[in-house]
Amino acid sequence: YEQQQLLNELLAEEYQKNIVKNDRTFNLQHFANYSSVKQRALLRLWLQDWGIALPSLVQLEQIISDVIFAKFDAQPQFRLDDNIVRRYQNRLFLTPMFTDISQEYVEAKFNHPISLPDHLGTLLLKKTTEKMIALWQDENGNTHKETLALPLEGTKVWIRFRYSGKVKLTPNGVNKDIKKVWQQLNVAPWQRQRIPLIFYDDKLQSAVGFFTVFQN
């Protein structure tokens, strides 16, 4: 135990250099330059910071080979208890295990908080005489706002979590594949299906807090 403590103290400064403060992700830029002993020790420190029970040597080595050093264009992940270790844009993320909500449809009510699936918070849709305002309070307590045109009389308003296809974001913009839009907005792949999407009937209008689609 004392040896472990001493090792942690010796590595503390190096460790802090690699941690992205705002989201506690691990920057992997210099990881390949470290010895395998140091790699495992830094990874252990990071998991410890998240309050994760210390993984076995085999698990640490699997995370290093299968996640950290996975192919550049892969979306690698490794399960540790109820958490997933993921890599995106050369950073290591730890997330809970998410439920697949890509097929969920929630019919919208106005002026009444709507509970979103899988602990994603609440969405409030407010109508004014000219606009509709969407306010999403996410699971971390952050509020995201989007202003939309009012739906036409008789239009069903839906909240969904998956869309594949093209979107146009400005009057003079081109139709872009939504995957490209998410990439430009730096939204990680696993987060893309956890953002409330507002549809009027079957037409995507908005990803709340991220963009509103320009309708011709």
Where are these regions (language model features)?
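AMP-forming adenylation/ATP pyrophosphatase catalytic core
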Residues: 1-216
